[in-house]
Amino acid sequence: MTVLFTDFAMRRPRGPPPERNTNMRNSPLHTPPLGPQLKRWRTLHRVKQSHAAELFGVAQSTISRWEAGIQQMSADERAMAERLLAARLDSAGDHALARLIAGSTARMHLVCDLTHRLLACSPSRAAEFTRPLSTLVGTSLWRYASPEIVRMEAALDPLGWHDRAGPPSVEFATGANASRVVPIRGSTCRWTRMMLSDGSAARLVETL
């Protein structure tokens, strides 16, 4: 199943794209509550709430409130949770997925669903970059997001994107960005969220 976004708000405006600063600070990454993801991580790794509380240096009741969405994490607690939940290629299956993407003829790449760090990339996508792929792998691509991508990211929560292991893919129209390093041109983009072996979430980004 795929969710399509073709309303006016998601379409590229007429005329040339406006100049924009691609600095990430001007387009803050929409950050959903991490409690539900922490709970899935605990379940997968059989970590009790009491042990998670020790890891974070908080009371067990705090872990419970995070997971229930009653209490939000502080900035330091969230940074620790992001390090814990960030996608990484650990298992043979994860690396096989990366090889499939690296060998694909389609324009696609794989990023961490939480941080947008680049995990894998197809040759046709890498050919669009003006920096060597090796210098971009492991870094966040969010700073290169187009305005449409920024809006779509903020629209994921109402879709239950972060609440389920395998939500429907989303397709939307994006305009261009102002980057020469990671250029984005007017096109249709598809995002698919998938779980890696350690329970972290990755996102397959395809240009259709």
At which residue positions do the language-model features occur?
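Short, intrinsically disordered or compositionally biased N-terminal tails of bacterial proteins
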Residues: M1-N26
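Short alpha-helical DNA-recognition segment
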Residues: R46-S64
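DNA major-groove recognition helix of helix-turn-helix/homeodomain DNA-binding modules
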Residues: Q72-D94
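Short, basic/aromatic recognition patches
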Residues: D90-R107
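Sensory/regulatory domains in signal-transduction proteins
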Residues: A106-M108, C112-L208
